[in-house]
Amino acid sequence: MHAPMPLLLTGRGFRRDLEANGCLAVHAPLEGGAETRLLRRLRGAGYRTRMTSARGLGDPEVFLTQKHGIRPPHLGHNCVGRGAAVGEVQQVVPLIGDLLDGDDSVALWILEGQVLSRSELLSLCDLCKREPRLRIIVEMGGARSLRWQPMKALLGA
C-alpha cells in the first residue's frame, strides 16, 4: 500500500523567498499550471495579484507605475493631418497602478521574461526596493520542475 501523495507545492517557501528578495526569477514547467497555483496561494496570503507578458512592455518601470503615452503602430502611407505620421499619442494608465491603491502587498507575475535585457531586469529589482509592497516574479524560461532564485543572483549583481 502506498502512502498518500503530499501536496506538490504549498507555496510557503516560495512566499518566504519572495518576501525576502522582492524580485524572483522562476523557471517553470512548460505545460503550465505552476503560475496559477502559486498566484492562488499568494492571493490566499493577502496579496493582490496580476499576470502580464514581458513582450511589448517597453520601459518596465514607466509601463508598470506611471501614466504614459503610446502611439498606434505605423501602417504605411497615412495622411499626416493633425497627428504625427504614426498617429496621435494615447495616454495609458499604469499596469499596476490600481493594485497599489490600499495597503495590501502586490505580486506581479511577468511571463516570457527572457526577452528583457539585463538592465530592464535590474530596474525591476530596484522598483521592488523603492516600493516595499511590490513583489515581482519573472518567468525566465522552462524547466522540468519548478525552481526559483533571487533575480539578483541570476544576474550576478
Curated annotation (Swiss-Prot):
PANTHER family: NAD(P)H-QUINONE OXIDOREDUCTASE SUBUNIT N, CHLOROPLASTIC. It is found in: Cellular thylakoid membrane. One of its GO terms (molecular function) is quinone binding. GO terms for cellular component: plasma membrane-derived thylakoid membrane. It is a peripheral membrane protein. It catalyses: a plastoquinone + NADH + (n+1) H(+)(in) = a plastoquinol + NAD(+) + n H(+)(out); a plastoquinone + NADPH + (n+1) H(+)(in) = a plastoquinol + NADP(+) + n H(+)(out). NDH-1 shuttles electrons from an unknown electron donor, via FMN and iron-sulfur (Fe-S) centers, to quinones in the respiratory and/or the photosynthetic chain. The immediate electron acceptor for the enzyme in this species is believed to be plastoquinone. Couples the redox reaction to proton translocation, and thus conserves the redox energy in a proton gradient. Cyanobacterial NDH-1 also plays a role in inorganic carbon-concentration. It comes from the Bacteria. The keyword Nucleotidyltransferase does not apply. NDH-1 can be composed of about 15 different subunits; different subcomplexes with different compositions have been identified which probably have different functions. The keyword Nucleotide-binding does not apply. It is an enzyme of class 7 (translocase). Coiled coil: none annotated. The lineage of its organism: Bacteria, Bacillati, Cyanobacteriota, Cyanophyceae, Synechococcales. Disulfide bonds: none annotated. Its EC number is 7.1.1.-. This is NAD(P)H-quinone oxidoreductase subunit N. It holds the Pfam family NdhN. Keywords: Membrane, NAD, NADP, Plastoquinone, Quinone, Thylakoid, Translocase, Transport. Belongs to the complex I NdhN subunit family.
